[in-house]
Swiss-Prot record:
Pathway: Amino-acid biosynthesis; L-threonine biosynthesis; L-threonine from L-aspartate: step 4/5. This is Homoserine kinase. Keywords: Amino-acid biosynthesis, ATP-binding, Cytoplasm, Kinase, Nucleotide-binding, Threonine biosynthesis, Transferase. It is found in: Cytoplasm. It catalyses: L-homoserine + ATP = O-phospho-L-homoserine + ADP + H(+).
Length: 309
């Protein structure tokens, strides 16, 4: 029998955004970034109250279909707990549908909130599994759960009927690596951007990406001078260029100047990893083009603060 949690118990969750793929690591590599959503969840006597401030305000649903609410319920079920009612207040800073892990952060925030409400019965591995299930791939969610960089993977069931299993391991990241996000003023649909990908790739391109993923792991951990080489890709970015021409232009422009630029997730954000600040002139050119610039650091894991009644 599920345990009913006490009215008045409240948690505050701070969850980082993330960048997925990092060039060659399609649906595998992720990096937590210092742009955060904060979610306050309180157990109330009955009903559901949802408020959203910041990114997505006036656009996202304010009922049980909100991703944070769905993730809270999934987390409570996994924790064998139930509540009479919930108040959920979201303060969003992660740009939505821009390739910065906003939906994964929402899923992580919900599951982590449920874990805090239930007095933390879930492991990090379970939180990665539950939150990744909403995405269908673990790279963004695992980065937000574990912090830093992650290598993630998916095991599909043999019979095709069981839930895929998601897992990840963290990577140490050199302290001097920073991220600069160039965020265009339009959304990108992950589903639409995935549709342009081919169903098959050549052995040469697969081999190219396998080697660059290995280089990228070394670059993050100990050789940041290899970031440019480690962000090269042949599996997804060349195909997505046709539907994200603005991003592709900026990625190419930056790479031609020696910067480790790549398409962040499904875009449209262009991300640069570096050990030195990007010159002001480059960033000013981006801003004059209507692009928002976020100068970020590698972030730590999701945090949960419990406020007892």
């Amino acid at each position: 029998m599920a345990i009913e949690l006490n009215v008045g118990r409240k948690v505050t969750v701070t969850v980082p955004g993330s960048s997925a793929n990092l060039g060659p690591g399609f649906d595998t590599l992720g990096l937590a970034l210092s742009v955060y959503d904060t979610v306050e969840v309180e157990i109330i006597p009955s009903g559901l109250e949802v408020e959203v401030f910041g990114e997505g305000q006036g656009e996202v649903p304010l009922d049980g279909s909100h991703l944070v609410v769905k993730a809270i319920r999934a987390g409570l079920k996994a924790a064998d707990a139930e509540v009479p009612g919930l108040r959920v207040v979201c303060h969003n800073n992660i740009p939505q549908s821009r390739g910065l892990g906003s939906s994964a952060a929402a899923a992580v925030a919900g599951v982590a909130a449920a874990n805090g409400l239930a007095d933390f019965p879930l492991t990090q591995e379970q939180i990665v599994q539950l939150s990744s299930a909403f995405e269908g791939h673990p790279d963004n969610a695992a980065a937000s759960v574990l912090g830093g960089a992650v290598v993630s993977w998916t095991n599909l069931s043999i019979d095709g009927k069981s839930q895929p299993q998601y897992a990840a391991v963290p990577l140490e990241v050199q302290d001097n690596i920073r991220a600069t996000a160039l965020v265009p003023n339009f959304h990108a649909s992950t589903e639409a951007v995935r549709r342009v990908l081919p169903t098959e790739v050549t052995h040469i391109d697969a081999r190219f990406n396998v080697s660059r993923v290995a280089v990228m792991i070394v670059a993050l951990q100990q050789r940041p001078d290899l970031l440019w080489e480690g962000t090269r890709d042949r599996l997804h970015q060349p195909y997505r260029a046709e539907v994200l021409p603005v991003t592709s232009e900026w990625v190419n422009r930056l790479r031609n100047r020696g910067y480790a630029a790549y398409l962040s997730g499904a875009g449209p954000t262009a991300m640069v990893l570096s050990t030195e600040p990007i010159p002001d002139k480059v960033l000013e050119d981006a801003r004059e083009s209507g692009i928002k610039v976020l100068e970020l650091e590698v972030a730590g894991p999701v945090k949960v603060e419990v406020n007892q009644p």
